[in-house]
From Swiss-Prot:
Primary gene name: ureF
Species of the source: Helicobacter pylori (strain P12)
Keyword Cytoplasm set for record: yes
Compositional bias per record (Basic and acidic residues), positions renumbered to this chain: 1-11
Protein's recorded name: Urease accessory protein UreF
Entry's Gene Ontology cellular component terms: cytoplasm
Amino acid sequence: MDKGKSVKSTEKSVGIPPKTPKTDNNAHVDNEFLILQVNDAVFPIGSYTHSFGLETYIQQKKVTNKESALEYLKANLSSQFLYTEMLSLKLTYESTLQQNLKKILGVEEVIMLSTSPMELRLANQKLGNRFIKTLQAMNELDMGAFFNAYAQQTKDPTHATSYGVFAASLNMELKKALRHYLYAQTSNMVINCVKSVPLSQNDGQKILLSLQSPFNQLIEKTLELDESHLCAASVQNDIKAMQHESLYSRLYMS
């Protein structure tokens, strides 16, 4: 009896969805490969066109080498990324399991209203819409009735919120979804640093390797947070994102 309780508690803590059989339409889909596919840099949502304020730090000589790039990444991941991206992913994932579309739309509204920089708001909407449309264009993939209802009713989707709905709709584990999303988005940031600072490719890989321990800490922290922490963002990053709007020359849209 005690053993059964322990298993139940563990499943809840890591966000393992209810054991539901695959539909015939998705019987051929391997979620292990699918989660790699949607997090791949070539998945066509346009994330490579955005730096989310990083370009301002680089032009203002705040990020100039491997050490300052790593410092920036740690600060960004533990503030803006954790309380907006990671937490909203978790909240929309859990709401999808509960079939609570109203709560998902509420989370997206909070993010939209809490994101002061215009470029970041537009970037969130573009990436979210593009993620949804790309999934819908994959005709072999049956996302289910709830995802389709979400896709029709969402007004301000973000990449993270739509990804959370996607992961839960296909019965992916929450912790696995968080892990893949965190790594993929951090890798994009590192690529931006390598191209724009610039850094060597080796320095970029050293940065990613050194972030493995912080990655695990961020995932565990995300699982502990609730909706009251949503968008507890970094004011400094918002300022840099606003300043990006008036940079003389720009490589990125945000």
